[in-house]
Design a protein with these regions (language model features):
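Short acidic/glycine- and proline-prone juxtamembrane loop motifs at membrane-interface regions
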Residues: 158-171, 210-211
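Transmembrane-helix motifs of polytopic, lipid-linked glycan transferases
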Residues: 99-137, 155, 178
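Start-transfer (signal-anchor) and selected internal transmembrane alpha helices
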Residues: 1-28, 143, 239-243
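Transmembrane-lumen/periplasm boundary regions of multi-pass, lipid-linked membrane glycan transferases
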Residues: 44-54, 200-340, 348-351, 368-416
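Membrane-interface transmembrane helices that cradle and orient dolichyl/undecaprenyl
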Residues: 144, 179-197, 202-205, 309-310, ...
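Specific aromatic-rich, kink-prone transmembrane helix
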Residues: 158, 172-188, 349-352
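Extracytosolic helix-loop segments that constitute the early lumenal/periplasmic catalytic or substrate-binding loops
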Residues: 26, 44-68, 75, 82-85
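Short periplasmic/luminal acceptor-recognition loop of GT-C membrane glycosyltransferases, typified by
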Residues: 421-434, 442-567
Length: 570
């Protein structure tokens, strides 16, 4: 027997404008008024910027001003570079590149919604018919489940930061969602169009990140077709597989043909192969500890959905669970896993979790609600208190800690940002009043506070705290200081142990002309170390007669030191 029994009143869908507004509130903050931030955001922007201002070789082989990035595939950077070409003159290159995150997010959000809708309107997913009628229509039920899936997807903590970075993870997770949408359409009604969409999604995934995740998803889809949905196997093998193979092969062929002698293709394939290893206890421990918070609140509701639907042979469980299992197994054999590699799990978890919403007990719904209310309201309150301390100096201890983390930071007051923060906070209070006061019966009531609270906290950070975050996470200050000490007639800059994010930031913000492979030794040398402990070892690597022109570091970072030398002519 199906585990769902509910009236039509529970399937009230969110208005389209409301969903669109929520998505815009989620993704737009952070696009404007900030520089590329350290680590992946700056490195990803550096590749886009290099492509936009470089040659055909830069477009085919991802690099940061000559620094090869063999573990990166080019698709996300092509999109960012194209946007820089189109809008960089108007918005600045950094903002234009960041529009790519908006495009990627839109693809992922739409794919999650559509997948849940396709699966939710199937007969096997429909609730039991009531004795005297009044059950929801199939389309209405599917739309409500789709709204719930999107809310759960947006509420996942792991998605928040990565979806705002100009790097491959933002596109990667969206293409995973697109692959599940195409797979749902194919298994629902086998046809060539859906198979082509699945093949294109898998092929583009390879161009976005590498072949490990696409391979895992392909195995899951093929296994599902062989075991349960054999009527889709022919389209899968004859259409999806050839398209999935052709797309990355075109890029590899272009590398071989247009860049003869280049080792980019071999280096990329080798870098992907190095991602895999035998299962280790550390990997299992990392997965268990990270996934608990990374996929909250999707994972507990998804686990409940599997239990609630355990007696039913349904596509919405088979498709998502097979994908989740394949991706978890891949994570277990991943060498030195990182948190962003778990992003691929979020779309299938969110889609599966929405089918658990109609079966949740009142106690579970209340527990999720109160956890969201207490936790996210406390975080929002602390953000406000920290901002007050930053602006006024009270409470003094908190203000001291704020400035200790960002020495030299000068607070600024922005009326427009304050108005947005106040309006968002009032909106949160109204949402609490609606959810806790009226006690609505709609399916997505269990996750609306989780999503709304997360959006609130992100908006507060991107309005009240953006200047501080920009100061603490950007290389703008040290790049500007270094630029003032560059000789007017210098030719180029060699580097020693300079990180990829730093290279990208100094090239863009500091306008440094870095050397490229094959260039003669430059007249300047930029060295990065972590202080006195390694300075002696660094000096042994440096050859020639050098004059120190400048040394410094980011005020907010005690472990990154930079020294700029000029090579003396012999």
């Amino acid at each position: 027997m199906k585990p769902v029994r509910l009236p039509a009143a529970a399937t009230l869908a969110l208005p389209r404008w409301g969903l669109v507004a929520l998505c815009l509130l989620y993704i737009l903050p952070g696009i404007l008024r900030r520089d590329p931030w350290k680590t992946d955001d700056a490195a990803g922007f550096g590749i886009m910027w290099t492509m936009a201002h470089g040659s055909l070789a830069d477009w085919l082989s991802p690099n940061i001003v000559g620094l090869a990035m063999p573990n990166e595939a080019p698709l996300a950077f092509w999109v960012g570079a194209l946007l820089i070409k189109l809008f960089g003159w108007l918005l600045t290159d950094a903002v234009a590149a960041r529009i790519s995150t908006l495009v990627f997010f839109a693809i992922g959000a739409a794919a999650v919604w559509r997948t849940a809708f396709v699966l939710g309107r199937r007969n096997e997913a429909q609730p039991l018919k009531l004795a005297f009628g009044g059950q929801p229509a199939a389309i209405d039920y599917g739309r409500t489940l789709a709204d719930g899936a999107l809310l759960i997807y947006l509420a996942c903590l792991g998605l928040l930061l990565r979806s705002h970075e100009t790097a491959t993870p933002a596109l990667h997770v969206s293409l995973v969602a697109a692959a599940f949408y195409a797979g749902a359409c194919l298994f629902d009604k086998p046809n060539v169009r859906s198979a082509a969409g699945l093949g294109a999604s898998i092929g583009l995934l390879v161009l976005a990140r590498g072949w490990t995740v696409p391979l895992a998803l392909s195995i899951a889809m093929l296994a599902l077709a062989i075991i349960r949905y054999r009527d889709s196997l022919r389209q899968l093998l004859s259409v999806a597989v050839p398209i999935a193979l052709t797309i990355p092969l075109l890029w590899l062929l272009a590398l071989r043909t247009l860049l003869p002698g280049s080792e980019v293709a071999d280096a990329w394939l080798a870098a992907n192969l190095k991602l895999l290893s035998t299962p280790k206890l550390f990997t299992l421990s990392f997965l268990a500890k990270t996934l608990v918070w990374y996929s909250w609140p999707a994972w507990p509701i998804a686990a409940w959905a599997v239990w609630a639907w355990r007696a039913q042979a349904t596509l919405h469980v088979a498709l998502t669970v097979s994908g989740i299992l394949a991706l978890i197994l891949l994570s277990l054999v991943t060498n030195s896993p990182k948190d962003h590699e778990l992003l691929a799990l979020l779309p299938p978890m969110a889609i599966l979790a929405t089918f658990g919403l109609p079966t949740l007990k009142r106690g579970a719904i209340n527990a999720i609600d109160w956890f969201s209310v207490m936790t996210l309201s406390a975080i929002a309150g602390f953000i406000w208190l920290g901002w007050i301390a930053k602006q006024t100096g009270w409470p003094p201890k908190l203000a001291g800690n704020v400035f200790k983390l960002a020495p030299g930071f000068q607070p600024e007051f922005n009326v427009f940002a304050l108005i947005i923060a106040l309006a968002t906070s009032v909106g949160w209070l109204l949402l609490l009043r609606w959810r806790l006061g009226r006690r609505p019966s709609v399916l997505w009531r269990a996750v609306v506070l989780s999503t709304g609270g997360l959006v609130l906290c992100w908006l507060l950070l991107m309005t009240l705290w953006l200047p501080w975050l920009n100061y603490a996470q950007s290389y703008a200050s040290v790049a500007g200081e270094m630029r003032q000490h560059l000789p007017a007639d210098y030719r180029c800059v060699d580097t020693n142990d300079l990180g990829s994010a730093q290279r990208a930031s100094f090239a863009y913000l500091g306008e440094l002309r870095f050397s490229r492979p094959g260039d003669a030794p430059c007249d300047l040398l930029l060295v990065q170390d972590d202080g006195l402990r390694k300075r002696g070892a660094q000096m042994k690597k440096i050859e020639g007669d050098l004059t120190l022109l400048w040394q410094g570091r980011r005020p907010a970072d005690r472990h990154e030191f930079y020294r700029l030398y000029q090579r003396n002519a012999r």
